Design a protein with these regions (language model features):
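Active-site glycine-rich loop that binds ribose-phosphate moieties when present
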Residues: 25-40, 51-57
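Alpha/beta-hydrolase-fold catalytic nucleophile elbow
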Residues: 5-6, 31, 74
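Non-catalytic peripheral regions of patatin-like phospholipases
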Residues: 9-11, 19-24, 46, 52-185
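A residue-level signal for conserved active-site and pocket-lining positions in enzyme catalytic cores
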Residues: 5, 28, 169
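Patatin-like phospholipase catalytic region
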Residues: 1-18, 40-44
C-alpha cells in the first residue's frame, strides 16, 4: 500500500510530502500540528506544521504516486460561505477555511491548466503528464454536512462526536453515490 503524508516546513512554507517508508511518528504528528495548539514538530532538524497549510491534500504528488487514473477527493472544509463573517469567531472560522482550501484550489487550477495544455500538445512524454492527461477526479463535498461545526470541534475527541462525524460522512457519501458513480461526478 502506498501512503503519502504532507507537512509544511515552517522556514519557507514549502510542502514536504513523505512517502510510505519515510513516514515516522514525527511526520504524522507534524502533519496534524496546528501551531496555535502545539509547538512545531522537528523532522530532521527542521520545524514542521500541519500539511494543510501548503498542500491540502497534495493532489499532484498523489496522482504521480498512484497506480490508478481515478482519484476521489473528499473535501471537508467548505469553499463557499454565505453572508459576511462579523464576529471574531466567524472571522477566525472563515479565515481557517480559506487558508486550508487555498492550496487545494491552486492545485486543482494547476491540474486544469496542465490538462488543457496536454490536450493541445498531444501525447505527453512524461509519466506524470500521461497520468494528469488521463486523470478522472471525482469530488465528494461534505461541506453541507460539516459547515455548522464550530472551529473548536477539531479538538473534540469524544466518541459520540466521532460517531456523529462518521454518520455525517456516510450521509455525504450516500448523497454523492448514484447509478452514475464512476461514470460522472
Amino acid at each position: 500500500m502506498r501512503l503519502l503524508v504532507s507537512a509544511t516546513r515552517v522556514q519557507d512554507g514549502a510542502v514536504r510530502v513523505f512517502r510510505t517508508k519515510a513516514i515516522s511518528l514525527e511526520v504524522v504528528l507534524a502533519s496534524a500540528c496546528l501551531p496555535r495548539l502545539h509547538h512545531a514538530v522537528d523532522i530532521h532538524g527542521e520545524p514542521h506544521w500541519d500539511g494543510g497549510y501548503a498542500a491540502n491534500p497534495p493532489v499532484i504528488p498523489l496522482v504521480g504516486a498512484s497506480r490508478t487514473s481515478e482519484v476521489l477527493l473528499i473535501q471537508l472544509i467548505p469553499t463557499d460561505h454565505t453572508g459576511l463573517p462579523v464576529t471574531k469567531a466567524e472571522i477566525d472560522k472563515r479565515l481557517g477555511q480559506i487558508t486550508f482550501n487555498a492550496p487545494l484550489q491552486k492545485e486543482l487550477e494547476a491540474i486544469g491548466m496542465m490538462k488543457t495544455l496536454l490536450h493541445k500538445e498531444g501525447q505527453p512524454t512524461s509519466r506524470l503528464g500521461r497520468k494528469i492527461q488521463s486523470l478522472q477526479l471525482h469530488h465528494l463535498s461534505a461541506e453541507d454536512y460539516v459547515d455548522d461545526l464550530s472551529q473548536a470541534s477539531v479538538l473534540d475527541t469524544k466518541w459520540d462526536f466521532l460517531t456523529h462525524l462518521r454518520d455525517r460522512g456516510r450521509a455525504a457519501a450516500e448523497a454523492w453515490l448514484s447509478p452514475e458513480a464512476g461514470v460522472r461526478s
